[in-house]
Amino acid sequence: MLGGLARKLFGSANDRRVKGYRPRVQAINALEPELEALSDEALRARTEDFRRQLAEGKTLDDLLVPAFATVREGAKRALGMRPFDVQLIGGMVMHEAGIAEMKTGEGKTLVATLPVYLNALAGKGVHVVTVNDYLAKRDAEWMGRLYRFLGLTTGIIVHGLDDDERRVAYASDVTYATNNELGFDYLRDNMKYERGQMVQRPHFYAIVDEVDSILIDEARTPLIISGPLDDRSDFYNTIDTYIPRLGKEDYEVDEKQRSVSMTEAGMEKMEQMLSAAGVLKSASLYDIENVSVVHHVNQALRAHTLFQRDKDYIVRNDEVVIIDEFTGRMMPGRRYSEGLHQALEAKERVQVQPENQTLASITFQNYFRLYEKLSGMTGTANTEAAEFADIYKLEVVEIPTNVQISRIDDDDEVYRTAGEKYAAIIELIKECAERSQPVLVGTTSIEKSELLAELLKQAGFRQKDFSDPTAFNGRELLINDRSGKSFAVLNARYHEQEAYIVSQAGVPGAITIATNMAGRGTDIKLGGSADMRIEIELKDLPEGAERAAAEAKIRAEVEELKQKALEAGGLYVLGTERHESRRIDNQLRGRSGRQGDPGHSKFFLSLDDDLMRIFGSDRLDGMLQRLGLKEGEAIIHPWINKALEKAQQKVEARNYDMRKNVLKYDDVLNDQRKVVFEQRVELMNDEDVAETVEDMRHALITETVAKFIPENAYPEQWDVDGLDTALKEMLALDLPVKDWAKEEGIAGPEVTERIIRRADELMAAKTAQYGPDIMRYVEKSILLQTLDHLWREHIGMLDHLRQVVGLRGYAQRDPLNEYKSEAFNLFSALLNRLREVVTAQLMRVEIVTQQPPPEELPPMEAHHADPFTGEDELAFAGAALGSRPQPLLSGDLAVAERDPNDPESWGKVGRNEACPCGSGKKYKHCHGRFA
């Protein structure tokens, strides 16, 4: 109460922050007449003038007012749009590394051009981050007109570009890209073997569109690049056959935590079945030999109990395709990790694809913290303001709307059963259709959107068929859309038609059923989209007077339809249940009432809804029965809204804690990742790494000698045999250590010195034999390849450690501290192993002068994996090492030219290589069987 009174008297902190920007807005407005008088060339010349001022010592803050004024004038000329005063404020918030919360339709895309232009003047590159390729292309082409007008270059990073195209795009002043592509490029860059092959520049400044979706919803989802492992499809299919034989008493499902665990009875039953089938390697299911079997049994159980077809995934073209829980979009190529996707494929009886091994990974939380400066924009961020401040040090500022919102938000209607709820929804849709009011119906899953579609068909409505992407025949289809008795379904099944469906959702009488609208990125305009109609109806009409007249006619029609939609009350947003996140609900509401248009929103709930059921609908059901609530009646009260909001806050708090916990663990890996990646870049930049490998060799020899010759020990106490064996195995050195031990007055340091001298002589001889250039290249290649190989193994070990370290809590030990300690020990072991392997390989290496045939690299894939649901987002990630001819190495790395008829000449052959005999089979299936 007192807080509310204080806010009335002094204004909120947000109000005061916004007020603080007003003087600079006035200064920008004051420059407008002066800039209007400039020619296009003179306006463009200001860009170079700003850069000169920066070079002379001015800061970006010093240039904010004139730069923003220049962008405003440029936008008027290049785009026909003039940023409002509140949009200038949004731009200032983002320049100051904040998050601008701007309602739908307030022009976030245009706002971003203000801080983008200002920060691009520094010449370090600005990244504008979007959630999908469509938005990246659209915004880059649209706003690119303004940047080009002002003399800046623009690049686009989307799926399917090669490295040269990416390098050019990243070298541009402004680069539009998706969050996934940025993260994958960073990981791929740190798998390259030459500095010139990398595509990204240092991370300077990024503006993240739909920042809540990327930095909150996807925060706990690592980006993963992986390579394939051996095919185990038979194993998954075998495990899957036993899951349906379990009864409900054999496992416990926790919907709140989205987890499932077997009871003791279930474990015994599963153990008996697997033992009888010969799957177990030892008597007990929980013996160490069966750890892999237990893991896959648990994943198969999750697949059958926690994941629903048409809600979490769909089966399309004999593949299991994941559905994004936040947007309802289909994500072809994305795969669940750690065997879960294979378990789903076995469950659905489709082809089981092989598992993958992680080669590199990073979370969005850690990727975006690489930037010197980070900012964002969204329509809904305030509910997560604390998380943005805590993790990303970003302050959320609510930007006032240019025109006051006039949408009416009704209290929720709560029904006892889902059937009663849907009946009420159908009635409201009918009422809206009678007055030609456009309706947007939001659902939480494909399953529920299709259930509602079926109910509408039963009520006499016709569903538009979008199964054929080529089915659009322009004007005819648009006329059919306005019949008032047809509806469109927007979900993962019709992803290709998404832009068209959204563009027509504001036409009078339009009925659109949509899974979560988060991240759609397209405004629903009352009357429909004139641009979309022009694109469809006039696609075959060439430029000229006839086309101009046709365009004018369409725009007039759209304006007329807009007036009809306004008279009918604007867009009616109808929610069919509450989402776990208030933010998703607010995004759905925000689709209506853009730029001051009238609108309406209401949520219909039932006690069968997921959120209600998980958070105590039993008690509410008893209360409603006692109140005498009849069938078909709803209860409407602000108290219910508050109770639901509290339930949502609980879920949000739990999810925040989970994300925070993930970050604590990932920070451990992130610190190590930074060290390894920075070291890689240094090694790539070094032309000569001879000194580095020499230091490694000397340190290894010193440690090895100390292990077998204790300090101040007599020669009789030395482990001479152990040292002799170690020198032969690690360094390929056969030295008279036993004779040295018999010398009078010999000591450990002198032995160390002799071994170092002999090893250095051997390496000097190799350099003289092959030439310094070849030897330096070989040293660098071995060092980088070994580092990569050991790092991949290290990631796998840390991942395994993370899965089991929680059990140490039962021993009253803090799992996080245990993880940090173990991870440090593993990292120290990695560095020691790096010294050993690099030194051993260089001491043995022989170089064959023939040019080897080009060797195909193993296929690699990029995944976007959720550590809790296991989701992986995949994109092919070629990681070619460059076109430079590589000398052929023998020993541990490669082999000389092989004679198919002489196995003696084959040397060491990889298990998955083609057999040198020429059979076409893999080595492990041919001569390797006898090796």
Swiss-Prot record:
Q: Name one GO cellular component term.
A: cell envelope Sec protein transport complex
Binding residues for ATP, per the UniProt record? Answer: 87, 105-109, 523
Q: Name one GO molecular function term.
A: ATP binding
What GO biological process term is on the record, naming one? protein targeting
Cell compartment(s), UniProt? Cell inner membrane; Cytoplasm
State the UniProt keywords alphabetically: ATP-binding, Cell inner membrane, Cell membrane, Cytoplasm, Membrane, Metal-binding, Nucleotide-binding, Protein transport, Translocase, Translocation, Transport, Zinc
- Binding residues annotated for Zn(2+), in chain numbering: 915, 917, 926-927
Entry's EC annotation: 7.4.2.8
UniProt family annotation: Belongs to the SecA family.
Say what the protein does: Part of the Sec protein translocase complex. Interacts with the SecYEG preprotein conducting channel. Has a central role in coupling the hydrolysis of ATP to the transfer of proteins into and across the cell membrane, serving both as a receptor for the preprotein-SecB complex and as an ATP-driven molecular motor driving the stepwise translocation of polypeptide chains across the membrane.
UniProt-recorded name of the protein: Protein translocase subunit SecA
